[in-house]
Amino acid sequence: MRASNYHINTLKEAPADAEVASHQLMTRAGMIRKLAGGIYSYMPLGLKVIRKVEHIIREEMNASGAIELLMPVVQPAELWQESGRWEQYGQELLRIKDRHQRDFVLQPTSEEVITDIARNEIHSYRQLPVNFFHIQTKFRDERRPRFGVMRGREFTMKDAYSFDRDEAGAGRSYDIMFDAYHRIFRRLGLAFRAVAADTGSIGGSRSHEFQVIADTGEDLLVFNPDSDYAANIELAEAVSLLTERARPAEALQEVATPGAAKCEAVAELLGLPLSQTVKSIVLATESEKDGVQIWLVLLRGDHELNEVKVGKVPGLQNFRLATEAEIVEHFGCKPGYLGPIATAKPVRIIADRTVANMADFVCGANRPDFHLRGVNWGRDLPEPELVTDLRNVVAGDPSPDGKGTLAIQRGIEVGHVFFLGTKYSEALKATFLDETGKPALMQMGCYGIGVTRIVGAAIEQNFDNRGIIWPRAIAPFEVVICPVGWGKSETVRNKSEALYQALREQGIDVILDDRDARPGVMFAEWELIGVPLRVTIGDRGLNDGVIELQGRRDTETVKISVDSALKEILNKLETL
């Protein structure tokens, strides 16, 4: 490709609404242009990257035995109503009507459609197992689309769905996809982790996320550097350091804490470590049978509540935060000074494991500007109704596998695999006839990869103050040839053309910048775009029989012989 025949339109400044590096750099490099909130046009450079990502995914999916098809973006509401997700999915599901006033959705995912295909196409155990996949546009009506292609409303995903005769077969299909995903992300040139994860709205009983490691990631990944243990922080179990509660050493006393409504302020005022305080979080549930039920969740002052874990507590599946009126009614006090002793009305008390092991702790007195210190279970208040893991782990916590301690890093989710079981096949009655001629439900798995999200995540992991640093496998071009003096020197033009043709013959994706731009402008533009390897050809070097190479991550150029240039470039590419 010649730059003079290609669309390259870089910008000096990023748009004001671009919050993260990938959004800023993709816009400045001319890879995307915003059409509406969370909706982007992919310009030639950006689309080229996407196509390379898709190519790697498609190759590995084919190698794993998956079969490609294509399902529609527009799906009838009846399927979503049949699965129960028409109401469950929430406002992210964009609902539309056709001219006949029939309800449809713009697909955010395709479990319903693929299950409908399976129930109509698969009738016998002889047709199983099978794994279908497609790469398709999706739409989720995000309330606040942000971060460019990282959290857009319209995006591209690869979805695969496996169908098996039994749970054992579904487990094998899951493992095949799990391994295929490792191959995909390794080929993409990304540093990543596969972590155990919550199944979320998709459902199912087994799940792993594939997370690209990046300091700007929204997700917290918990792992053991000394073992294979890794999990999303939502799922990581917090193992209590203490096995036996200490004996009481203080008397219960009420202390004035004027204006200290936060645990941090209370600890500072009383001269105590934050870990000696207990925070009170008031939740509510509603049911036709019991009406509104108020729950008091107790957490150590230096810990954070894990809402996924709370949602798995029996009775708290559909919890919400209690209103201030509900809090005052049940505690006789506004938030900030709440505690489990002497509530105005009965509440259900559940405690994190760490809190249940505490002695002589500090909590709210259910009286404005007062707290209780020297509080002890059994002596000053009954043992909690339920003790369970309710908190996020912190770095240094014991690893759940018993092999050392945990570390935490940030990541960006780019892939997710789920074992679904019969969640959708049962809802949509997707059955097959087994060996005995009896109908049985298909066991399902689903496996997603965010194609456009990978592009953003790759940049978040690979950039500097000059621009993008693409992994070679997905760079828009592998090599850029930058002739210095293109319009003045026939020798420069001839050598540049010869090297350009030689690289093309070797199958290298190369672009020749024949626009006759000034060297500084030319170099800065290609550093912004992020091409992995730059070759500079000028009269001064040619007079000495050399040209210059510089990898995008390199700080210095390397002079190489003109005669061995092709070999040197190919060798350098192998290291990128």
Curated annotation (Swiss-Prot):
One of its GO terms (biological process) is prolyl-tRNA aminoacylation. GO terms for cellular component: cytosol. Disulfide bonds: none annotated. GO terms for molecular function: aminoacyl-tRNA deacylase activity; ATP binding; proline-tRNA ligase activity. Keywords: Aminoacyl-tRNA synthetase, ATP-binding, Cytoplasm, Ligase, Nucleotide-binding, Protein biosynthesis. Catalyzes the attachment of proline to tRNA(Pro) in a two-step reaction: proline is first activated by ATP to form Pro-AMP and then transferred to the acceptor end of tRNA(Pro). As ProRS can inadvertently accommodate and process non-cognate amino acids such as alanine and cysteine, to avoid such errors it has two additional distinct editing activities against alanine. One activity is designated as 'pretransfer' editing and involves the tRNA(Pro)-independent hydrolysis of activated Ala-AMP. This is Proline--tRNA ligase. It comes from Bordetella avium (strain 197N).
